[in-house]
C-alpha cells in the first residue's frame, strides 16, 4: 500500500499530530526533513484573530476538527473508480505555531511553515483558522515563486476585501483579499 494513508488498513494504527488528534486522512506525519518524499503536504493554521462578528467562533479549532472528521475518508472516489493516492504521495506537516493576540507573530509562523513546503516546490493544502491565514500563505507563495502568477480561487459569502477593520487592524479576517 505504498503512498496509501493508514485509513485504507482497518487494522492500521492512525498516526497523530498530537495526542488525540489524527493526521489528515491518516496520512503519515512528516517532519521538515521528510517533505521531499511527498508531492502534497498538509499543514494547519489554527488561528482566530481579531473578532469581527460580535463573538469568537472557534476558528482556531478548525485544524483539529477537520483532521478528526477526515479520518473517515480516503482518496478513493467510487463513482469514478479513481484513487488519488495511486498518483500522489502526501504527508501531514502539523500545525504552525500560533500566538493568541499577536497577528504578526502568528502570521510569521504560518509563513515560515509554508516556506518549508514551497521552497521545495511542493504543493500544499492548508486549513485553519480564520480567513486571514490567506495572507501569510500568499506571502510565502510570492516569495518562493518570484515572477510567477499566483491565482486565488475565493469561495465565500462575502469578498473579505476591506483595507482594515475599523481603520485599526489590517490583518483581520475581513481583509485578506484586499492584500491578495
Q: What are these language model-derived features?
A:
Residues 2-180:
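Conserved alpha-helical scaffold segments that buttress catalytic/binding sites
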Amino acid at each position: 500500500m505504498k503512498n496509501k494513508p493508514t485509513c485504507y488498513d482497518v487494522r492500521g494504527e492512525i498516526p497523530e499530530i498530537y495526542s488525540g488528534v489524527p493526521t489528515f486522512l491518516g496520512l503519515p506525519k512528516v517532519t521538515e526533513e521528510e517533505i521531499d518524499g511527498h508531492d502534497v503536504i498538509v499543514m494547519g493554521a489554527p488561528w482566530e484573530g481579531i473578532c469581527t462578528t460580535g463573538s469568537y467562533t472557534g476558528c482556531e479549532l478548525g485544524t483539529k476538527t477537520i483532521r478528526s472528521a477526515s479520518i473517515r475518508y480516503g482518496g478513493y472516489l467510487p463513482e469514478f473508480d479513481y484513487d488519488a493516492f495511486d498518483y500522489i504521495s502526501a504527508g501531514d506537516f502539523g500545525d504552525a505555531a500560533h500566538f493568541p493576540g499577536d497577528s504578526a507573530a502568528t502570521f510569521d509562523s504560518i509563513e515560515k511553515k509554508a516556506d518549508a513546503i514551497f521552497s521545495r516546490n511542493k504543493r500544499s493544502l492548508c486549513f485553519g483558522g480564520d480567513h486571514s491565514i490567506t495572507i501569510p500563505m500568499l506571502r510565502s507563495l510570492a516569495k518562493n515563486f518570484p515572477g510567477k502568477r499566483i491565482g486565488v480561487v475565493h469561495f465565500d459569502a462575502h469578498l473579505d476585501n476591506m483595507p482594515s477593520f475599523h481603520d485599526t487592524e489590517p490583518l483581520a479576517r475581513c481583509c485578506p483579499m484586499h492584500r491578495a
